[in-house]
């Protein structure tokens, strides 16, 4: 198999990747990230009105019950189901709102009401951040121990690749305005696990190939050869995973399952990006750091 020079344009690829991710995050901050009630607290009422409605009428009904500004979300499947999200309502306010909807729309379905206190939402958000940090630290230790023969630059590069994955996911959520909630945490941890698995496969092949060459051999050739050898497996695994996620997405679109859509869409994008980062980002960073370390040692 002909060896592909994946590192030929590493600086350009890294620069473009960083610019795209930073642009997405800046856009998300400038236009406000959408935090779901899981993390900010609030009340969510989902109900099928079973007849045509005007969104402004729904807002008028809510404003007649409470001064809290609502967010009205319509169903993407074309039916008359609406989701009303506000700051936390009391039980009396929720009951009054349902009664007002029943008065205007006489054939509504059974409503689903969910309340999350703001303090609990903040606690959950902080816990999610801590869990993410702990996961990355443990992965750093694992990669450092397993690939210690490659040097600690390998472990550091793998973690930088994971940080890139996390930042990319934040960029996606900022651009497409997916709500940041408990599903976001599940997507994040899944992508991180998938990406580090791809990276470990490449690193493992690099370690094996380095045993077959002399110390004076160009590490760039070893890296390119290792990525080329693992490329087929990586692509097949990614495609298989994306097909499975695609089935989930189709089901979510047909059945109008909002949670599954919030999970499958960013996950499919993240899986593709995780494959990209394990091939181009982590290995490019590792090669650059490894050359800098050897250059400094030679200078001494």
Which role does the model predict for each range below?
Residues 1-300:
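A structural signal for conserved, well-ordered secondary-structure elements
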């Amino acid at each position: 198999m002909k060896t592909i020079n994946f590192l030929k344009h590493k600086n350009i690829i890294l620069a473009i990747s960083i610019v795209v991710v930073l642009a997405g995050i800046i856009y998300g901050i400038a236009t406000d990230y959408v935090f779901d009630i899981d993390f900010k607290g609030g009340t969510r009422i989902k109900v099928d009105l079973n007849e045509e409605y005007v969104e402004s009428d729904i807002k008028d009904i809510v404003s007649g019950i409470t001064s809290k500004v609502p967010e009205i979300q319509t169903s993407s499947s074309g039916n008359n189901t609406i989701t009303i999200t506000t700051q936390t309502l009391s039980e009396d306010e929720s009951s009054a709102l349902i009664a007002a909807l029943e008065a205007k729309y006489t054939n509504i379905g059974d409503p689903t009401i969910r309340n999350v206190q703001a303090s609990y939402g903040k606690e959950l958000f902080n816990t999610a951040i801590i869990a993410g940090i702990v996961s990355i630290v443990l992965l750093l230790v694992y990669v450092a121990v397993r690939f210690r023969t490659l040097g600690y630059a390998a472990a550091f590069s793998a973690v930088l690749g994971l940080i890139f994955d996390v930042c990319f996911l934040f960029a996606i959520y900022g651009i497409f305005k997916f709500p940041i909630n408990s599903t976001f945490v599940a997507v994040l941890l899944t992508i991180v696990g998938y990406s580090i698995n791809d990276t470990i496969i490449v690193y493992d092949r690099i370690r094996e190939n380095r045993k077959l060459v002399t110390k004076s051999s160009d590490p760039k050739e070893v890296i390119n050869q290792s990525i080329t050898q693992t490329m087929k497996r990586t692509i097949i695994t990614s495609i298989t995973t994306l097909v499975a996620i695609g089935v989930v997405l189709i089901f979510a679109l047909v059945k109008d399952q909002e949670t599954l859509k919030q999970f499958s869409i960013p996950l499919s994008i993240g899986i593709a990006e995780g494959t990209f980062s394990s091939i181009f980002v982590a290995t490019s960073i590792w090669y650059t750091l490894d050359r800098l370390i050897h250059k400094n040692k030679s200078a001494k």
